[in-house]
Amino acid sequence: MDRRYLFLLASTRRDGNSEQLARRAAAQLPAGTSTTWLRLDEHPLPPFVDLRHSSGYGDPEGTARELAEATVAATDLVIVSPVYWYSLPAAAKLYFDHWSAWMRSPALKLRERMAGKRLWVVLVDSDQAHEGSAAPVLDSLRRTADFMDMTLAGALVGHGSKPGEALQDAAVAAAADTFFRSGPA
C-alpha cells in the first residue's frame, strides 16, 4: 500500500521552527511518497458545538469536509505545531474537537477509517529540553491515537523561539533526518 502523508501545520507563523523541522524530516521520505501540506489557519473551522445529546451531527461541509476528507485519505497524519502554553495552538485543538462530530458522521466514519493509521508529531517549544513543556501535548496526542486505534509512530521535539533556532541543535537536526524511519513512540 502506498503511503500518503498529511502534514497539518498548526502554527500561524510561516516557515517557523516546527515547519522547518517537519520539512527537513519529509525531505528524507522515499522519492514519490505522497505528501499533502495544509495550514490550519488557511482552512478555518467554525466553532465546535457539542450536539451529541441533542440534534446530532450531519456530514461535514465546506472547510470541515475538506479537512475531514484529507484526514481519512492519509495513511500517516503528521501534526506540525509549536507548543503554546503547554498545549496545541487553538486551530489544532479545534481540528481535534471536530473529530467528535466526524466520528459520528455516517458517511465519513472517521474512527473506523483512522484505525490502524499512523500519527506523527513534530513539535517545537521555546523551553530547554529538560523542562518538558511539550509533555502535555505529547500525552494528549498519545491518548488521541490510543482512542482512535492509531499508532503514535513518532514524536520529534525541537526547542527554539526565533525561526531557524530548532535546527541549530545538531541532535534535533539529525533526528529529523531519520524521523520517518523510527518505530512507534
Functional labels for PLM-detected ranges:
Residues 44-49, 120-121, 156-157:
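Short, basic/glycine-rich phosphate-binding loops at helix/coil junctions
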